[in-house]
Each structure stands twice: as C-alpha cells, then as structure tokens.
C-alpha cells in the first residue's frame, strides 16, 4: 500500500498487522493498494447453474422455495431471484439464477421445485465455475446512466412484500423511458462460512445471518436522475424495514451495510459500527492529516464515538 506520506508498505498478518486489519473493510481511508495477494482454492469440477425466467404468477411458489432455502442448503448451493424486464418480451418477469457445486443430478433434485414450474426461459446447464461470474454481464450494457444500491434481508420473506415490490418495479418500468435494463435481485448465498469469522477480526463489519439484496437502476435522461435515486432508495428502505435485520436484531451483530451499495448515503459510524474507534486510532498513525477521506471520512462530525 502507498500511504499518505508516500511510504510503500506491506500489510499482512506478519507485516503491519494493524494496517492489514484496517485495510480489510476500510482500505479506502488508509492508502492506495498497488498489489493484492489472494488465497485461492482449487475448483476443478464443473458446476450446475444458469438463468431461469418465470411469469409473475409463479411468484408465490418461488417465494415458498426461497423461504425453505436456509434449511435445505448444504453450502454448495446459491440462488439469486428478483425482477427484470428482458428485451425479448418487454415485460416484467421473475429472474432467477441457480448455482450448485456438484453433479447435475444432485442439482436438479435440489432445485426441482423451481425447475418444475415450467420456466419461460431455461438456460441452466453444467458449466466451468468461472463462467458463473459472467451470467449477469448482459444485465447492464455500456452507456446510459446507472445507479447501484442495496440493503439486507432475512428469511422468511413475506409474499405480500414481494408482490408490492413487483408492482413497484413494474410501475417504474412502465412510467419512465428507457429504464428496461434495471433489475432488483435478492442474493441467497450461504453465510455459514462467513459468520465463522468474527466481526471484529477485520474492519469489515457486515457479517451475520442475513443476505444482500441489490438493485441496479438504468436510464438515459439526465432530467430524471433525482427521481431514479428517490425511487430506488424508497424501494431499498421498504425492504430494509420490512425484511431486513432491523426486524430481527438477534441474527448477528453485523451492521447490515455493504459499502458498495450504500455509497455516500451512510456515515462511517453506521458502516463500521464498533470498529470505528480503533479505525480512528489507526488513522492517526497511518494518515494523521486525513488525506484519504473522500468516501467515508472517519473524522466527519457524524462519526463521533
């Protein structure tokens, strides 16, 4: 990392471990990373995955499956679902993305309740693991104006909430011009391994028995910038209040905030929670003049502890 005074240092469990702690979650406040070393794991076998599109009348059945996911998963499964407006039909549909790290037979057995719902589009198959990360590439093509936001959610989900969100999303798609690349996705990735790492092990404080929900709003007309932000934030607030950890604080001591989703809309105090006092101490050691403050200023007046 390049520090505020120009020094180049290593941050690891062996070298500058306090900076290593801070960089994993609050690196934007401490310097510029010029080299990253990751711990990788072999993934030699192919995985089962792909996209399914469903008509909106299948929403209750899909929510039923989602609400049982937590009790059925072994850690080898993943599921995204939400709302999209694919150009091939030009109407709002339910988009799901399946993932199974295992054989096709096992995968089809696990996801049978979804596969049996006669999806309008079924692009599931065995594929190399690295291809899974490309499945959403076509969701937001180059050009135009885009905004990402998100929040957290817990299970079970209320079907009435999902029906409201579907209607809200569909109304936006019908009301505003050239917004049909937008999407709302609930991301069910097993958290069992994630919560084995204590929240105070790094500056990243967003670990708990909950999931992320992400939205990307896409449009082209600058004059509706503020409207798109308002509509998106209103939708995220509805999900957070009615499905997030705000209703279930016993699900962990994580903040429930992911920096890449909340952007500048959350303070460092909200984002880093109990880690903020230590971060402020380390800030005085590594960046006492507060050079790196553009994203989440650790010394902003809102972050008094």
Where on the chain are the PLM-derived regions?
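Soluble FAD-dependent oxygen oxidases
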Residues: 1-305
């Amino acid at each position: 990392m390049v520090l505020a005074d120009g020094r180049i240092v290593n941050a690891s469990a062996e070298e500058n471990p306090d900076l290593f702690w801070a960089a994993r979650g609050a690196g934007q406040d401490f310097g510029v990373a010029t080299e990253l070393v990751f711990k990788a794991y072999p993934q030699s076998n192919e995985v089962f995955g792909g996209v399914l599109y469903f008509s909106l009348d299948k929403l209750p059945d899909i929510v039923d499956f989602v609400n049982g996911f937590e009790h059925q998963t072994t850690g080898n499964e993943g599921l995204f679902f939400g709302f999209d407006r694919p150009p091939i039909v030009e109407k709002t549909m339910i988009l799901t993305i399946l993932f199974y790290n295992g054989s096709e037979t096992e995968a089809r057995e696990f996801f049978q309740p979804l596969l049996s719902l006669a999806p309008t589009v079924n692009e599931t198959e065995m594929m190399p693991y690295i291809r899974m990360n490309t499945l959403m590439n076509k969701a937001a093509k180059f050009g135009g104006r885009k905004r990402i936001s998100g929040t957290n959610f817990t299970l079970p989900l209320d079907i009435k909430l999902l029906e409201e969100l579907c209607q809200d999303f569909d109304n936006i798609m019908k009301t505003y011009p050239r917004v049909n690349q937008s999407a709302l996705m609930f991301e069910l990735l097993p958290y069992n391994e994630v919560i084995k790492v204590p929240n105070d092990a790094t500056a990243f404080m967003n670990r708990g028995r909950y999931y992320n929900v992400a939205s990307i709003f896409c449009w082209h007309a600058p004059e509706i910038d503020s409207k798109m932000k308002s509509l998106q934030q209103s939708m995220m607030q509805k999900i957070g209040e009615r499905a997030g950890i705000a209703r279930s604080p016993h699900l962990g001591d994580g903040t429930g905030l992911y920096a890449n989703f909340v952007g500048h809309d959350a303070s460092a105090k909200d984002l880093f929670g109990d880690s903020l006092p230590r971060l402020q101490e380390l800030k005085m050691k590594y960046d006492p003049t507060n050079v790196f403050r553009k994203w989440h200023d650790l010394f902003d007046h809102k972050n008094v502890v």
